[in-house]
């Protein structure tokens, strides 16, 4: 059954759903969602992102992460987390620049927050030659908080469903 048919059936059986729930399902449903069923990003996809235009963007993010780690006192462990890493280009560029500080790379626990299996595969390919191998989680609440976190989130807000609130008084 198609996603459209499943959504229609669910609405008939249980009543209205919020726009946010509807958009979330349309984007991330594992069997019919936009990000789960097609390459959305890149030359063959529907859009490109800043890291795909120039490696300088990701490299500057990498240098910023190293500097932030140093300002944190160069802790022995730090979680470098990217939310919605697309095809992995930004992180690949960031890690390449971060090689200037091998101590930073030794401290990094790289975590990518990505629910889409096709995008996880693309990220794995992009980061295959990296000095650090990522760990994937599906959501931010899966990140451990026993070490400092450096969070990167480029172009992720436009992938989130909007929630509407109405003030009545």
Question: What does each of the following model-derived ranges do?
Answer:
Residues 152-169:
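A mobile, often basic/glycine-rich helix-loop segment
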């Amino acid at each position: 059954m198609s996603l459209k048919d499943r959504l229609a059936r669910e609405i008939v059986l249980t009543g209205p759903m919020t726009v946010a729930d509807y958009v979330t399902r349309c984007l991330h449903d594992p069997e019919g969602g936009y990000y789960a069923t097609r390459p959305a990003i890149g030359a063959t996809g529907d859009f490109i992102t800043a890291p795909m235009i120039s490696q300088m963007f990701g490299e500057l993010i990498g240098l910023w992460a190293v500097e932030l780690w140093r300002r944190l006192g160069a802790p022995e462990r730090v979680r470098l987390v990217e939310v919605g890493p697309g095809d992995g280009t930004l992180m690949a560029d960031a890690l390449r620049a971060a090689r200037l500080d091998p101590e930073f790379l030794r401290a990094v626990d790289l975590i990518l927050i990505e629910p889409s299996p096709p995008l996880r595969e693309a990220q794995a390919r992009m980061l295959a030659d990296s000095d650090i191998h990522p760990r994937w989680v599906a959501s931010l609440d899966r990140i451990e908080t026993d070490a400092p976190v450096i969070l990167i989130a480029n172009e992720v807000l436009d992938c989130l469903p909007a929630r509407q609130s109405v003030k009545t008084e």
